[in-house]
Amino acid sequence: VAGTRGLMGRSRMGIVVRKGAPLPDISSTEAFRQAMLDAEAIVCNVASSGVYMVKLLEKLGIGETTKDKVLKLPDTVKVMEHVAGSPAHAIGVGQLAEISELADKGLAIALVAPLPDAIQNVTAYNAAVITASREQEAARALARFLAAPEAKAVFAATGID
């Protein structure tokens, strides 16, 4: 329905290491590239974050060099659990919202930082009322609720801006 589409929030990708491990410098694209070369393992999921990461490594010219240390796991929980339990200098990749949630639950991971803006992958969450909806008023109410400052505060607390 025209005029009902709205941005609810954006999720960005971040890098984690095991809690207590040295934090690599990923403050720029070149620093990020070097951190990936220095890592003993790069752990990502098989979903969109992992697909993006593999393509990013290729784009940075280090896909071939790093391919043997890229470990793809089924989901972000498995990625973060692996990094938390890894004695090696492993770097994990995931959505900031998921990283925040798992760290809050006590998983022994430390957020290094979001990916640098120049190489960041942003997932946008939108809401809209579809024309085929039989409950358009309820859908409009939900979209208004999700766009309200109170909902935005909840999103922000979970890493979605």
Which residues fall in each region the model found?
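Exported/periplasmic ABC-transporter solute-binding proteins
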Residues: 1-161
